[in-house]
């Protein structure tokens, strides 16, 4: 998967299209990411010792990696490729050519 935790990304599809934020969690087994402040859903919680009445909690839900593009340091969004630099495999922005790692 080309997106990692801590990457700055732009959402390119869905209800939060155009939002730029940071990846909180990457879920490579299901090809999804959780992005800060994106795809907020309301989760109904049962009553427990902390919340005797129960609660409705807003939290971030995962979105598919195909709906985000990684931004480089200059804020250019593009596809991610891999190349070898000094014997190390690094990610780079295919549009700007800038190394991401």
UniProtKB/Swiss-Prot annotation:
One of its GO terms (molecular function) is rRNA binding. NCBIfam families: rplX_bact. Keywords: Ribonucleoprotein, Ribosomal protein, RNA-binding, rRNA-binding. This is Large ribosomal subunit protein uL24. SUPFAM superfamilies: Translation proteins SH3-like domain (SSF50104). Belongs to the universal ribosomal protein uL24 family. Part of the 50S ribosomal subunit. It comes from the Bacteria. InterPro entries: KOW, Rib_uL2_dom2, Ribosomal_uL24, Ribosomal_uL24_CS, Ribosomal_uL24_KOW, Translation_prot_SH3-like_sf. One of two assembly initiator proteins, it binds directly to the 5'-end of the 23S rRNA, where it nucleates assembly of the 50S subunit. One of the proteins that surrounds the polypeptide exit tunnel on the outside of the subunit. GO terms for biological process: translation. GO terms for cellular component: ribonucleoprotein complex; ribosome.
């Amino acid at each position: 998967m080309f997106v990692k935790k801590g990457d700055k990304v732009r959402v390119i599809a869905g209800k939060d299209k155009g939002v730029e934020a940071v990846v909180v969690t990457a879920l490579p087994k299901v090809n999804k990411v959780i992005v800060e402040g994106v795809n907020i859903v309301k989760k109904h919680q049962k009553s427990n010792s902390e919340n005797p009445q129960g609660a409705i909690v807003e939290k971030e839900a995962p979105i598919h990696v195909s709906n985000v593009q990684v931004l480089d340091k200059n804020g250019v969004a593009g596809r991610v490729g891999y190349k070898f630099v000094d014997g190390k495999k690094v990610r780079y922005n295919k549009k700007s050519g800038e190394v991401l790692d």
